[in-house]
Amino acid sequence: MKQRLIIYAQLMRLDRPVGIFLLLWPTLWALWIAGAGQPDPKVLLVFVAGVALMRSAGCVINDFADRAFDPHVKRTINRPLATGKASSQEALLLFAGLCLVAFGLVLLLNPLTIGLSFAGALLAATYPFMKRYTHWPQAYLGAAFGWAVPMAFAAQTGTVPIAAWLLFIATVLWATVYDTFYGMVDREDDLLIGVKSTAILFGEGDRLVTALLQGALLLLLFWIGYREGLGFYYYLGLAIAAGFAGYQQYLLRSREPAQYFRAFLNNNAFGAVIFGGIALHYLTA
């Protein structure tokens, strides 16, 4: 039993929690702005737990979708489905179980949030298959991750205002950037096995395109702060985040997969300082 639990934890990537934080940060941005710095405690707990559950579910369905590809990619060759330690049926049952628990939590919220959750579940379930059909699965991941933003506004305020959609777009831009960095790690393997990604699409222009996307993201976050009346601490956080974006571009210069992965991981700090700026604004307002 213990060994099975370890395998299921690996399927859910509980040993690599950075993905949970990358999904959590924009959710917290949204909850703090929607709640003017004081989100409803029940809503906050539901979303934190829901983020962990749905990120875990996303990892499981991703491994199920990639079970034929992962044995041929160096980074993924030891995943449970790739090695045969877990079966496809186990993965699907685990995915369904995680989604059911997450939906049970959503039922504690208002009808608008419940309705939005169906679109979120569809995005999460279909994202892993996008790399077969489009070079933009990273943007699709952004939509899946970003869907927590309108849901957070709906849960906190009962509406989905323009600010929610602007934050959603910002999250799509952000996820496209950091998941492109992630895709750059596997680019050579992905070319061999025939799957698509923005890393492949951008090719030698990857640094330029991701830098432009980061610039657009920072400008959008600046505009959101202006619209919402956020003050000094928010812009301080945004300035630090801009520094992190520059550092990520510096890491890409070496053209080494290990540095691409470091650039990906650094986005956890990017998301954290944005949240810190939002939280400090409301604490000191």
UniProtKB/Swiss-Prot annotation:
Enzyme class: transferase
Keywords, sorted A to Z: Cell inner membrane, Cell membrane, Magnesium, Membrane, Transferase, Transmembrane, Transmembrane helix, Ubiquinone biosynthesis
One term of GO molecular function: 4-hydroxybenzoate polyprenyltransferase activity
E.C. no: 2.5.1.39
Cofactor(s), names only, from the UniProt record: Mg(2+)
Protein localization: Cell inner membrane
Main localization of the protein described in the UniProt heading: membrane
Entry membrane topology: Multi-pass membrane protein
Gene Ontology, cellular component aspect: plasma membrane
Pfam family, one: UbiA
GO biological process: ubiquinone biosynthetic process
Reactions that this protein is recorded to catalyse: all-trans-octaprenyl diphosphate + 4-hydroxybenzoate = 4-hydroxy-3-(all-trans-octaprenyl)benzoate + diphosphate
CDD domains: PT_UbiA_COQ2
Transmembrane segments: 17-37, 41-61, 92-112, 135-155, 158-178, 216-236, 263-283
InterPro entries: HB_polyprenyltransferase-like, Prenyltransferase, UbiA_prenyltransferase, UbiA_prenylTrfase_CS, UbiA_sf
Pathway: Cofactor biosynthesis; ubiquinone biosynthesis
Superkingdom of source: Bacteria
Family membership noted in the UniProt record: Belongs to the UbiA prenyltransferase family.
Reported function: Catalyzes the prenylation of para-hydroxybenzoate (PHB) with an all-trans polyprenyl group. Mediates the second step in the final reaction sequence of ubiquinone-8 (UQ-8) biosynthesis, which is the condensation of the polyisoprenoid side chain with PHB, generating the first membrane-bound Q intermediate 3-octaprenyl-4-hydroxybenzoate.
HAMAP family to which the protein is assigned, alphabetical: UbiA
Name this polypeptide is given: 4-hydroxybenzoate octaprenyltransferase
Gene: ubiA
